[in-house]
Amino acid sequence: MSNAPLLTFDGVSRHFGGLKVLQDVHLEVPQGGIFGLIGPNGAGKTTVFNLTTGLLPVSGGSIRYQGQDLAGLKPHQITRTGIARTFQNIRVFKEMSLLENVMVGMHSHLRYGAVGLLASSGLFRSEERRARDRARELLSWVKLDHKAGDIADNLSYGEQRKLELARALATEPKLLLLDEPVAGMNSAEKTDLMVEIRNISARGYTVFMIEHDMRFVMGLCEHIAVLNFGRIISRGDPDHIRNDPQVIEAYLGREEDEAGGDAALVEGGAR
């Protein structure tokens, strides 16, 4: 595996009128493993993902993926380079089966597209068969293959999150962006998803996640960067982040820091 970073932010800024959401952000996501980006509400974390996936242009600096500058690329073009994303708000097709949901995720890599696959015309049957086999395999990775024919709306909240993971993987990415993957989950669902993300990472995918649940992040990520008021204020492993005074202050302020600090940062949370 190359030592070169998979994703690089080099002096990236993003302004909305006079509002500076990101300022001179330098960030490197290494190949392999699980990288976390954390920070207080309004720090600019989601903007980092929106810039990476082409939903917004940068105001300054550059973003490179595998050495390629992403400037000017449309979201679907960025997907084809090998970047996939899930969103904080679940976006599954609730009236479609799990299998169909995952097959739709394959459209950018199929000769006939998703509509052709779902139409099951004779011209598309060979490709459809391969796509269905791959979709079932991806569902098995998140332990949903036994529900492949079920309607997505009948899944639990946690299962819909896992379906989103499978659909994102269907685009054949190298880099998987997870936007608050455990938002709204209970403790058991979080533990289950942590296992699935570790399994995905072990298969060779690079995972880059934004998450507010500090225990989840500290228990899962090998590398973490902290964003505050649009600037990176700390980077390192969980132990470094947990004990960095700048990070504690960013989350709590000086007065609360002096009163004892944040338990999730200090204890490190789930293992």
Sequence positions of predicted segments:
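Glycine-rich phosphate-binding loops of nucleotide-dependent enzymes
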Residues: 2-271
